[in-house]
């Protein structure tokens, strides 16, 4: 009775219908598979092995539109997070007398020395030094193609930069226009 086909049934093509108990089913017959030579099979095996052990290197400059996994790099440091004072410069390049110069192009600049800074004005102000530059100056802004999707918080407490508008991140879409 196993080979009998009833009138309401049609013969089942096993290449089309494969159920879960036919996991190991391999079709046999001259039209069911393509012949592969041993050289081609070895080449395909090496390609597959390279693909299995290939670890894609993440971009060194992740963007926000790439999604959160772009920021899971194991080699991300505080420099990548934009905290320039976390790693003070290793060696001074200029002469020693340049050390006490004003280090910012901001209209409300602070001297690099703490004593000069206290003599300069309000002690409640944030100290601006070479290790903590003002992030709103043009040289610290990202390039137009790199900075897409980012916004920098103000790094300077001066009145000039407090009037600068900061883009607000819209939760349901892209960055909203600048407003205050």
Curated annotation (Swiss-Prot):
GO biological process assignments: flagellated sperm motility
Primary location class: nucleus
GO cellular component: axonemal A tubule inner sheath; cytoplasm; nucleus; sperm flagellum
InterPro entries, per the entry: SPMIP9
Superkingdom per UniProt: Eukaryota
Localization (cell): Nucleus; Cytoplasm; Cytoplasm, Cytoskeleton, Flagellum axoneme
Keywords: Cell projection, Cilium, Cytoplasm, Cytoskeleton, Flagellum, Nucleus
Function: Microtubule inner protein (MIP) part of the dynein-decorated doublet microtubules (DMTs) in flagella axoneme.
Assembly and binders: Microtubule inner protein component of sperm flagellar doublet microtubules.
Name assigned to this protein: Protein SPMIP9
UniProt source species: Bos taurus
């Amino acid at each position: 009775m196993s080979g009998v086909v009833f009138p309401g049934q049609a013969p089942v093509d096993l290449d089309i219908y494969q159920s879960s108990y036919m996991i190991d089913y391999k079709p046999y017959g001259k039209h069911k598979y393509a012949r592969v030579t041993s050289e081609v099979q070895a080449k395909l095996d090496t390609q597959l092995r390279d693909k299995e052990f290939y670890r894609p290197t993440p971009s060194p400059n992740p963007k926000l539109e790439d999604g959160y996994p772009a920021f899971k790099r194991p080699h991300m440091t505080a420099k990548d997070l934009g905290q320039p004072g976390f790693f003070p410069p290793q060696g001074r390049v200029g002469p020693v007398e340049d050390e006490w110069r004003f280090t910012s192009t901001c209209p409300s600049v602070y001297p690099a020395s703490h004593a000069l800074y206290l003599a300069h004005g309000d002690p409640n102000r944030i100290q601006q030094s070479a290790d903590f530059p003002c992030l709103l100056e043009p040289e610290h802004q990202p390039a137009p193609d790199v900075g897409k999707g980012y916004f920098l918080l103000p790094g300077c407490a001066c009145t000039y930069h407090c009037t600068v508008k900061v883009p607000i991140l819209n939760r349901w879409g892209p960055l909203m226009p600048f407003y205050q």
